[in-house]
A protein has these predicted regions:
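Positively charged n-region of N-terminal signal peptides that target proteins for export
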Residues: 1-6
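Hydrophobic transmembrane signal anchors and adjacent membrane-proximal interface regions, especially
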Residues: 7-8, 37
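Bacterial N-terminal signal peptides
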Residues: 8-19
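Conserved functional micro-motifs across diverse proteins
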Residues: 21-219
């Protein structure tokens, strides 16, 4: 009887561990229309809106199994809504994070994220000048699992077009490890969004600090 009890206890413990692991599987957030996010730029004439939602605090970042902040990355949930009657092309889209001190950062490719996670000292932003006095980083052990690689791949913003009356979304990752407060005074510039005839829309500029403010309550 005691043996059976011990077996049941162990089985329950194992089941609990499995359940916890399963619960940690990444699920990409369901995107809302871009203009509903605090940090967005809405081109009403062109009927296209783009939003940027930084996952820069522990509560939001807990959807990931990877601690991106610990490795110097800023995940931004990027949302494009096309309310027009024609598709738009984003195959040549360029996204740039511009900080308060005019530092410019472009999204990091998955393979560069893998390299940083495997080797925390790796430089994934060779084109960006470091700060005169780098912010000391916590020593991080380099390792990456297949699950983490799959999570990074599946979370990426990968759309090449946005069909009429639809929204596309996904994460862009920026290497901001040397910046203490990357959101303060920063904005995201977006170019290379084209209409169905190939003409480029006016560039989008999104003030990231607005993401720190809750949306106003309806009257």
């Amino acid at each position: 009887m005691q043996l059976l009890t011990r077996v049941l206890v162990v089985s329950c413990a194992v089941a609990g561990v499995v359940a916890c692991l399963a619960a940690k599987d990444f699920v990409k957030p369901v995107a809302q229309p871009a203009k509903t996010y605090p940090a967005h730029d809405d081109h009403t004439d062109e009927k296209v809106a783009i939003a940027a939602d930084p996952y820069d605090n522990p509560d939001k970042a807990k959807i990931f199994s990877v601690d991106f902040h610990e490795h110097g990355f800023l995940p931004i949930f990027f949302v494009i809504t096309n309310d027009g009657g024609q598709p738009i092309s984003i195959a040549n889209m360029q996204v740039t994070l511009i900080t308060a001190n005019r530092g410019k950062f472009t999204p990091i490719a998955p393979e560069d994220i893998f390299r940083r996670l495997s080797n925390p000292q790796a430089n994934t932003n060779p084109g960006v000048n470091p700060l005169p006095i780098p912010i000391p980083r916590k020593k991080v052990k380099g390792t990456i699992s297949k699950k983490e690689m799959d999570e990074i791949e599946s979370s990426q913003f990968a759309a090449r077009a946005v069909e009429p009356h639809t929204t596309q979304s996904g994460f862009l990752y920026f290497d901001v490890g040397d910046i203490a407060t990357p959101i303060a005074g920063a904005h995201v510039d977006v170019t290379g969004v084209n209409d169905v005839k190939g003409a480029e829309l006016m560039y989008f500029e999104i003030e990231l600090e607005k993401s720190q403010n809750p949306p106003p309550k309806p009257n």
